Swiss-Prot record:
Regions crossing the membrane: 23-43, 85-105, 109-129, 137-157, 172-192, 212-232, 278-298, 308-328, 329-349
GO BP annotations, alphabetical order: heme A biosynthetic process
Enzyme Commission code: 1.17.99.9
Catalysed reaction, written as an equation: Fe(II)-heme o + 2 A + H2O = Fe(II)-heme a + 2 AH2
Organism per entry: Beijerinckia indica subsp. indica (strain ATCC 9039 / DSM 1715 / NCIMB 8712)
Quaternary assembly: Interacts with CtaB.
Topology of the protein relative to the lipid bilayer: Multi-pass membrane protein
Protein name in UniProt: Heme A synthase
Alphabetical list of InterPro entries matching this protein: COX15/CtaA_fam, HemeA_Synthase_type2
Keywords: Cell membrane, Heme biosynthesis, Iron, Membrane, Metal-binding, Oxidoreductase, Transmembrane, Transmembrane helix
Family listed: Belongs to the COX15/CtaA family. Type 2 subfamily.
Binding-site residues for heme, renumbered to this chain: 276, 337
Cofactor(s) annotated in UniProt: heme b
């Protein structure tokens, strides 16, 4: 007689539930990796000026690239009709077009894959009754977020097809922030499935979680500001550090050159880069304070180690940002900078989630 035959029914049910939870957690962490890759591939698409190479949105038929010489030429002719071609790539041949096309096509294909990798396992776990309590609506919300991101991506691309030679930087920022929020949501859901005993009293955990939440908010703002920098190509200007145009704090008249005033925060290259620099210092300072606060409150426990790890990632990201700036945004540096932004974000979410559970 096996151990399973003699085990109490309640114990068997508990084991089945634990296995289901582990499977759901593995699925969610896998989705987080896919979204991470999606953001990095999106960065490569932007840095190679590939984002406008596909001028139509075909959610189903667009999953396949052109399969004949005639189809490739037709796609190329479509691209030649938009302003970017004449302004940036008037000498591009078909081989060059195929290069940028495959970046954008791969980005969209990965988006479709993420949609399938979300919907099918969700349906499977739902029908098998293996979703943890309270997760059904949350996961439906995640699926809706993915669909919304597809629409926002096309809305962003449309902004560069008629009167501009690039996508609107504010739409790029919305696209990246929505991807970042989706990533945050997945990491939070996955991390929440790891149950451990409470180690921190509710009063101490609440205060520390408030600080961690402020850090997370600052990181999200910084990611949005980074998208504005990328959309304006502001990283290719003012390529000195720590001074910008010979000053740590640029003249107010230079920062407020455009009218109305709000336009400077999204259209003024100097202002956009300056605010990205300043918020980087803010994130670094808040993270350093979190380390002192956590270690002073809890000693050298698990939460302090997480805070130190987050500080290390933030410091590495600041150094990468400086290198990206002074080297005038080489592809490798731009991609590493974007990848590290998501690593910082994921660590910040995991830290906040653990504190919310008293760990």
């Amino acid at each position: 007689m096996s151990a399973l035959d003699t085990a109490p029914a309640g114990s068997l049910a508990e084991t089945h539930a634990q296995r289901g939870t582990r499977a759901v957690a593995f699925w969610l962490w896998s989705l987080a990796v896919l979204v991470f890759l999606m953001v990095v591939l999106g960065g490569a698409t932007r840095l190679t000026e590939s984002g406008l190479s596909i001028t139509e949105w075909k959610p189903i038929s667009g999953a396949l690239p052109p399969l004949s010489a005639e189809a490739w030429q037709a796609e190329f002719e479509n691209y030649k009709r938009i302003p970017q071609y004449a302004a940036l790539f008037p000498d591009m041949d078909l081989a060059g077009f195929k290069f940028i096309f495959f970046f954008e096509w791969s980005h969209r294909l990965l988006g479709r894959l993420i949609g399938v990798a979300t919907a099918l396992p969700l349906l499977f776990f739902w029908l098998r009754g293996r979703l943890p309590e309270g997760y059904r609506l949350k996961l439906l919300g995640l699926l809706a977020l993915g669909g919304l991101q597809g629409f926002v991506g096309w809305w962003m691309v449309k902004s560069g097809l008629s009167d501009r030679v690039e996508v609107a930087q504010e739409r790029l920022a919305i696209h990246l922030i929505l991807a970042s929020l989706t990533f945050c949501f997945i990491v939070w859901l996955a991390a929440s499935l790891r149950k451990r005993p409470r180690e921190i009293s509710p009063s101490k955990a609440s205060g520390l979680a408030w600080g961690a939440g402020l850090i997370l908010l600052a990181i999200l703002v910084q990611i949005g500001l980074g998208a504005l920098v990328a959309g304006l190509r502001a990283g290719r200007a003012y390529n000195t550090w720590p001074l910008i145009e010979g000053n740590f704090l640029p003249p107010v008249e230079s920062l407020t050159l455009l009218t109305p005033l709000w336009r400077n925060f999204v259209d003024n290259l100097l202002t956009v880069q300056f605010q990205h620099r300043m918020v980087a210092y803010l994130v670094l300072g808040l993270t350093l304070l979190q380390v002192f606060w956590t270690s002073g409150t809890l000693g050298s426990g698990r939460a302090t180690k997480r805070a130190i790890a987050l500080l290390g990632l933030v410091l590495a990201q600041v150094i990468l940002g400086i290198l990206t700036l002074v080297l005038v945004v080489p592809l490798w540096a731009g991609l590493l900078h974007q990848a590290f932004a998501m690593l910082v974000l994921g660590m910040a979410v995991a830290h906040l989630q653990a504190l919310s559970q008293g760990r």
